[in-house]
C-alpha cells in the first residue's frame, strides 16, 4: 500500500487536519501539517496506536451483533482524534483542530481509504 500517498491525500483533504499516521505491521507512516507542533513524541504516538489497535480488536468481538466498526472518535482538550482501520490489521490515526467538522472529515477519510484498501 502507498502509505505516504494515503497520508498526503488525507492531510490535504481538509485544512483543519493537524496530523495523519498509518500504523501497519509495526511500521509508522506519518505526515504533519506544516507549521504545527505535535503534542506527542513519535514513541508516544506508537504506544498510543498500539493501544488503539488493541481496542479495535476488542470492538470486533461484537461484530455478529451490531456489525463491523467503521471508525472511532475521541475529543480531547486540544484535539479530536479519529481512528479508522485499514488493511488487515492497520490503523489510520488523524488528529484535527477542535473547530473542525469531524463528521465531514471522517467521511472524506473513509472515501480516501476505499481508494487504497478493501475495508
PLM ranges: what are they?
Residues 1-119:
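Non-catalytic interaction/Regulatory regions outside core domains
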Amino acid at each position: 500500500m502507498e502509505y505516504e500517498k494515503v497520508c498526503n491525500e488525507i492531510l490535504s483533504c481538509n485544512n483543519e487536519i493537524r496530523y495523519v499516521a498509518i500504523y501497519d505491521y509495526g511500521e509508522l507512516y506519518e505526515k504533519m501539517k506544516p507549521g504545527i507542533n505535535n503534542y506527542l513524541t513519535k514513541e508516544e504516538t506508537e504506544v498510543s496506536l498500539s493501544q488503539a489497535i488493541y481496542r479495535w480488536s476488542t470492538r470486533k468481538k461484537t461484530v455478529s451483533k451490531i456489525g463491523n466498526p467503521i471508525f472511532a472518535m475521541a475529543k480531547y482538550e486540544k484535539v479530536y482524534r479519529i481512528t479508522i482501520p485499514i488493511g488487515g490489521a492497520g490503523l489510520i490515526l488523524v488528529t484535527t483542530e477542535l473547530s473542525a467538522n469531524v463528521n465531514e472529515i471522517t467521511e472524506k477519510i473513509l472515501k480516501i481509504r476505499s481508494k487504497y484498501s478493501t475495508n
